[in-house]
Amino acid sequence: MSYLRYYNMLDDFSAGAGVLDKDLFTEEQQQSFMPKDGGMMQNDYGGMNDYLGIFKNNDVRTLLGLILFVLALYSPPLISILMIFISSFLLPLTSLVITYCLVTQMYRGGNGNTVGMSIVCIVAAVIIMAINVFTNSQIFNIISYIILFILFFAYVMNIERQDYRRSINVTIPEQYTCNKPYTAGNKVDVDIPTFNSLNTDDY
């Protein structure tokens, strides 16, 4: 007689033939290491059919925000306001304002008004960033961002006014200017007869 007739090795295991997969592991164990839906994560980043989920990735958001920010740097001041406003939905407005003010003052320069407004915008942005470290109030973020955007709008308008004044005060090239001295008086080198110089005795 066969040995297996008296001894069945499957009797020594709690899980043998006919046991389903769900009976092998508890629910917590399945949630910890077993993949779902073909390994695609749908909770945070979208699944295979959720193409809009790609915009939730930080790398894509950062890339689009940086592209708009660079376009804002090389655009007219009024258009740059719109670019920064759109970029604020992708990147923090505080970082955009600080970088824009620093770069603009470096390659544009400006008078006392623009320099002062840039300092005010930078200080306000730094204060907002510091407060956000300790608080996470959505109401404070909305109010502070509105105030910061108003200050930034005033700064950009000062730049627009400065560029307008520079366009008016255009220097005339030297070849088109008259550099010869001029004094008032008679420039004709001939004697102009007068009434007293006429000789009337001959008539």
From Swiss-Prot:
Gene Ontology MF, one: helicase activity
Cystine bridges: 101-121
Propeptide, chain numbering: 1-16, 185-203
Region (Binding to OPG125 scaffold protein): 1-38
PTM comment: The 23 kDa precursor is cleaved into a final 21 kDa form by the OPG083 protease during virus maturation. Phosphorylated on tyrosine and threonine. Its phosphorylation state is regulated by the OPG054 kinase and the OPG106 phosphatase. Phosphorylation by OPG054 kinase seems to be required to form the membranes associated with IV.
Modified residues (Phosphotyrosine): 203
Pfam families: Pox_P21
Keywords: ATP-binding, Disulfide bond, DNA-binding, Helicase, Hydrolase, Late protein, Membrane, Nucleotide-binding, Phosphoprotein, Transcription, Transcription regulation, Transcription termination, Transmembrane, Transmembrane helix, Viral envelope protein, Virion
Outcome (variant: residue 18 to A): No cleavage by OPG083 protease in N-terminus
InterPro entries xref list: Poxvirus_OPG144
GO biological process: DNA-templated transcription termination
Transmembrane listed as a keyword: yes
Coiled coil, from the record: none
Residues flagged as site, Cleavage: 16-17, 185-186
Main location: virion
Virion surface side: 1-65, 160-203
Membrane-spanning residues: 66-86, 139-159
GO cellular component, one term: virion membrane
Keyword Phosphoprotein carried by entry: yes
Bilayer topology term: Multi-pass membrane protein
Role: Envelope protein which participates in virus morphogenesis. Needed for an early step in viral crescent membrane formation by interacting with OPG125 scaffold protein. Its interaction with OPG125 scaffold protein leads to the formation of rigid, crescent-shaped membranes that assemble around the cytoplasmic virus factory. Acts as a membrane anchor for the protein OPG154. OPG144-OPG154 virus envelope protein might be involved in fusion or attachment, and can further associate with OPG153.
Family the entry assigns: Belongs to the orthopoxvirus OPG144 family.
Subunit note: Homodimer; disulfide-linked. Interacts (via N-terminus) with OPG125 scaffold; this interaction helps OPG125 to associate with membranes. Interacts with OPG140. Interacts with OPG154; this interaction allows OPG154 to be anchored in the mature virion (MV) membrane. Part of a complex composed of OPG144, OPG153 and OPG154.
Protein name, UniProt field: Virion membrane protein OPG144 precursor
Organism: Vaccinia virus (strain Western Reserve)
